[in-house]
Amino acid sequence: MKKLIYYFGSNGSDGNASMKNVLGNKGAGLAEMSNLKLPIPDGFTITTELCNYFYTHNNNFPKNFQNDLKKAITELEITTGKIFGSTSNPLLLSVRSGSTVSMPGMMDTILNLGMNNEVCNALTDSCGDKRFALDSYKRFLEMYGTTVLSIPSDLFEQIYEKHKIQADIHKDSDITVELLEKIIDDFKWLHIKYTKQLINDPYEQLESAIKAVLHSWMSNRAVIYRKINNISEGFGTAINIQAMVFGNLGKTSATGVAFTRSPSTGEKKLFGEFLINAQGEDIVSGTRTPMPIIANDSNSMQAMMPEVFKELSQIAKKLEEHYLDMQDIEFTIENNKLYILQTRTAKRTAIAAINIAVQMVEEKLISKEQALMRIDPESLNQLLHTRIDYSKGLTSIAEGLPASPGAATGIAVFSPYDAEKLSHHHKVILVRHDTSPEDINGMHVSSGILTIRGGMTSHAAVVARGMGKPCVCGTSNLSIDEKKQILTAGDIVIKQGDIITIDGGSGKIFLGEMPLIQPTFSEESKLILDWADEISSLKVRANAETVNDALVSIKFGAQGIGLCRSEHMFFDKNKIPLVREMIIAPDIERRKLAVQKLLPLQMEDFKALFRVMKDKPVNIRLLDPPLHEFLPTTEEDKKNLANSLNLPLSMINQRLHAMHEVNPMLGHRGCRLGICSPEIYQMQIEAIFTAIFELHKKEHIECNLELMMPLISNVGEIKKLKMDIYEVIEELEQRYRYKFSFMLGTMIELPRAALGSKKIAKEVDYFSFGTNDLTQTTYGISRDDIASFLPYYLEEKIFESDPFTTLDEEGVGELIEIALKRGKSSNANLKLGACGEHAGNPASIEFFHRMNLNYVSCSPYRIPIARIASAQAKIKHG
């Protein structure tokens, strides 16, 4: 068996920062801080190896583990000068989880372990403060009871509140020694009621606590968190056992969390909060609203504890310069002595990540490549958060702490269950006293989070920032009744289902729906995206059909349009009647008449698009979807169509019935339409090329056209369509006495097209892989119907991910690789692109880079994500 226990503390450490897979994120940090000679409580880390052994051996420990554990405790007793379980000089322990990947609040912690009546009395004698000793005992009974014995936490809360009410006490700090003794007696009774015993033996407490932490690795909340954040279950958790240091030892003791820069904005100054006379869980749980570390008022640590603040500032600077990244630091102050409990790379908003990365490049701490690799591409969604338009003279009903930026409007809900249930049909704002790890699913589906208690480093704030959701915490001027499902702000009562708006940037709360403004990129955001473009070889284009789409795409840095779905232009209310006439017309003459009516409308659409894009490439796909998408379904629409064609309604119904397809997505669509009804594609070709000519002649705009044929399955279809297309173009060239320049390409979205790509490539200038349909036709799964069984497939690990979100490299990816190799073998100059949902997915973009594609094309709002992902792929793979 590998070594299971590593020491750290004032005498150095057995480990270091590189050992995260063995020691976990927290343990590796403690080891490294020991090596840096920073003030940390002595302790040891039990490696992730124990967790993996535990789960593969029926929840049992290895043979000699108990002996190794006792040896480790003995070493700790020697370095601290205290004895575990002693009735004269007791050593108390903290037992904390520590995954290899940070999972804040998702797993269990037990503080003050080793407590019993005798130890409590000894602690009183050694420190001379009975209230402190009793408070520590009370905390242990509650934490051990909920974490190890699975006693519902609200039962402890009820006992605590009952005694406070009976004694007419409102502040925790006013609780007397006598009242604490009564609360402890009731907590003990609760232990005995649930487990038939009170565990007083310190070693029995320790072993059961270790097992509880190991069990928490597979707790529901931890499993959900890993699933949401794509963290492997195979990592396991380490366990960190340390000598307790006490932040609840009076007015010269405290606990807190500090960030070396702002996790919301990235501003370069120490940021964080602390609580005097408290333990760590008080600040993280959000049950008390903390005070700032640095501020201009007398309640800040800077003002109240200037010497400790100075030392903390120096340590924060040292840690950031050592790790070359922003740090999240947990600390405790015991009688004015500072101890660092943990440091880790801090979670941050997207804008903070960008600002910090740019700052650190400018400070010459890291390179541009390192800066880019620190940006989570998906987190850039946060840059697209809306904000409230305050120019409208709005009045808020309450204000709290701005815990996570962005504005959100939705109906108020008061439980995670209701959030999940109602989010299917509404945007929801989850309103709670404070959130806990059990709320993770409800938080995930909510548009925003509002808590009455807690600060900027509470569970709600940290998780919301990680998810990129707006959050307001610490709204002390609001009151909530979760059972009655009402929120009160003065005379205003908000019930479940009422619409509210929260602003996570200012902390303001509003009744009703507020006007919102779309965000703009900061200069730092533009700069880091420019760095991405400098490095990446895979260009990023947009899927766009409208002028608005094109403008948004250019704003976000698109290098062209990689997919213009021309049929989207047909769904305009002025065009759809003409499209229906074209489809339903019983003879060629009437069809041509409808086509001619559509021609000028489609031409204006293309002109508007080309005008915005100027000389950037615009890849237009000819009409693709099945005709049923355009056909009338209501009686009113059918009657209107009959009138416009001057046909009886019965004939319209006959035509509709004749055109019915059992499986339209694999039926009369794409190039099959263009071959069987050539006048449709002829009209589109004339509209496109006439638009190009008129822009050239009248506005001196030189368009960069790429023309694409959809749903090709064999080279015969290509040859037929090419003949028809060039016939129209040649006629237009003669009419306008102008030579058109363009590229002709095809979608590769059917397996047969991929396999037959050698012949197809000879006929075209480029391939664009339509990965949506290629995935559908490879799997034989409809993208619209996969939701009915996908959750089960993911849960059973039949699929590792949704194949319509992340490209299946083994199946669909192999077809793409076959197609590009065979295509290039017959056409060395063949250009390659990809469009569809996968083109905006970072993991899929990495695959496209490895395949040496020229570009990807995604929705406008995925462009920043794709630009960063493209650069990261280049940095990783060259």
From Swiss-Prot:
Q: Where is this region: Linker 1?
A: 348-404
Phosphoprotein as a keyword? Answer: yes
Any idea which UniProt keywords this protein has?
Answer: ATP-binding, Kinase, Magnesium, Metal-binding, Nucleotide-binding, Phosphoprotein, Transferase
What residues bind ATP, as annotated? 96
* Gene3D superfamilies for the chain: 1.20.80.30, ATP-grasp fold, A domain, ATP-grasp fold, B domain, Phosphoenolpyruvate-binding domains, Phosphohistidine domain, Pyruvate Phosphate Dikinase, domain 2
Q: Region annotation N-terminal: residue ranges?
A: 1-347
**Posttranslational mods:** Phosphorylation of Thr-457 in the dark inactivates the enzyme. Dephosphorylation upon light stimulation reactivates the enzyme.
What protein family is recorded?
Belongs to the PEP-utilizing enzyme family.
Q: What class of enzyme is it?
A: transferase
UniProt protein name: Pyruvate, phosphate dikinase
Q: Which gene encodes it?
A: ppdK
Give the sites modified to Phosphothreonine. 457
What activity regulation does UniProt give?
A: Activated by light-induced dephosphorylation. Inhibited by dark-induced phosphorylation. Both reactions are catalyzed by PDRP1.
The residues listed in the UniProt record as binding substrate, with positions renumbered to this chain, are 565, 621, 749, 770-773
Q: What other comment is given for this protein?
A: The reaction takes place in three steps, each mediated by a carrier histidine residue located on the surface of the central domain. The two first partial reactions are catalyzed at an active site located on the N-terminal domain, and the third partial reaction is catalyzed at an active site located on the C-terminal domain. For catalytic turnover, the central domain swivels from the concave surface of the N-terminal domain to that of the C-terminal domain.
Entry-linked Pfam families: PEP-utilizers, PEP-utilizers_C, PPDK_N
Needed cofactors, names only, are:
Mg(2+)
> Which organism does this record belong to?
Rickettsia felis (strain ATCC VR-1525 / URRWXCal2)
Q: Where is this region: Linker 2?
A: 503-537
Description of its domains: The N-terminal domain contains the ATP/Pi active site, the central domain the pyrophosphate/phosphate carrier histidine, and the C-terminal domain the pyruvate active site.
Per the UniProt entry, the Enzyme Commission number(s) are 2.7.9.1
GO terms (molecular function) for this protein are: ATP binding; kinase activity; metal ion binding; pyruvate, phosphate dikinase activity
Superkingdom, taxonomy of origin: Bacteria
Q: Which reaction does it catalyse?
A: pyruvate + phosphate + ATP = phosphoenolpyruvate + AMP + diphosphate + H(+)
